[in-house]
């Protein structure tokens, strides 16, 4: 069984390296056949895990998930095997809450408190929590990640955590995080537009307008800024100006402008 497993493993590694021309019959199919022969002789969990990895590489996600689920009930279940199952279920468009549950099992098996080595799992679960509409839990995962890596994070981290905070209606936290992202990367207009969005959500329309005007000074073709400007003006009962900006946003290809024109502009 060991020989079959090792041949299968070699072929899998070879195919993963994306060879120009396949050597003899070193394909995923042959790798799978070898690993399944090993399983027939002795169904060791490590063989089943290899079977899952090959099926995953072949994009047979249902088969891969079945293999990973077997491994997860065995004595070699680990953070990595539960992570594989969670990612596979996500690719199968499974229930987002079930994906999070698999990620919970992954993280529960990590050394506690979580160290920097295992911290990427927290980022993955944060994203999965967002997909499952559990923004507060996502925010807590980002907090735990920040602790695990001792605050060694970049602007993208603050942008993602801000989005979780905003969705969780933690507006002050959202404002603080987006300000931090901008401080670390002042030229990224996405962050500035997001800063305007948070201000708009908390009713600070004048602040939002000022931010948006600054964006348009830098890039007069930034369609989203015109749409957001229009939304601020609607709140300030300046419908004509707002409609002009929605129209401008539409001309610049903003996909959300049409709906606003229908709603507010005769």
Q: Model-predicted segments: where are they?
A:
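TPR alpha-solenoid repeat register
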Residues: 3-5, 47-48, 81, 116, ...
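Structural marker of alpha-solenoid helical repeat scaffolds
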Residues: 40-41, 73-74, 109-113, 148-150, ...
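Canonical tetratricopeptide repeat
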Residues: 6, 50, 84, 124, ...
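Canonical positions in the second alpha-helix
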Residues: 37-38, 70-71, 105-106, 144-145, ...
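Register position in tetratricopeptide repeats
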Residues: 13-15, 57, 91-92, 131, ...
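Terminal, low-structured helical/coil segments at or just beyond the last alpha-helical repeat
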Residues: 231, 235-266
């Amino acid at each position: 069984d060991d020989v079959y497993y090792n041949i299968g493993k070699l072929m899998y590694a070879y195919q993963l390296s994306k060879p120009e021309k396949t050597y003899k019959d070193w394909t995923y199919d042959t790798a799978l056949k070898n690993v399944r022969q090993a399983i027939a002789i002795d169904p060791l969990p490590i063989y089943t895990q290899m079977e899952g990895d090959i099926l995953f590489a072949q994009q047979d996600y249902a088969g891969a998930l079945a293999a990973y689920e077997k491994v997860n009930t065995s004595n070699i279940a680990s953070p990595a095997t539960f992570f594989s199952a969670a990612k596979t279920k996500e690719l199968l468009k499974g229930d987002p809450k079930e994906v999070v549950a698999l990620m919970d099992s992954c993280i529960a098996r990590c050394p506690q408190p979580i160290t920097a080595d295992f911290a990427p799992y927290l980022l993955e679960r944060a994203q999965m929590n967002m997909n499952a509409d559990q923004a507060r839990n996502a925010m807590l995962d980002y907090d735990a990640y920040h602790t695990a890596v001792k605050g060694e994070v970049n602007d993208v981290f603050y942008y993602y955590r801000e989005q979780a905070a905003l969705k969780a209606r933690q507006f002050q936290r959202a404002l603080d995080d987006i300000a931090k992202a901008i401080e670390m990367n002042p030229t990224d207009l996405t962050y500035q537009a997001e800063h305007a969005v948070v201000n708009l959500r908390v009713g600070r329309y004048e602040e939002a307008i000022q931010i948006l005007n600054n964006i348009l000074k830098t890039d007069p073709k930034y369609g989203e800024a015109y749409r957001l400007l229009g939304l601020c003006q609607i709140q300030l009962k300046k419908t004509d100006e707002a409609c002009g900006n929605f129209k401008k946003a539409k001309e610049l290809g903003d996909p959300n402008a049409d709906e606003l024109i229908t709603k507010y502009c005769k």
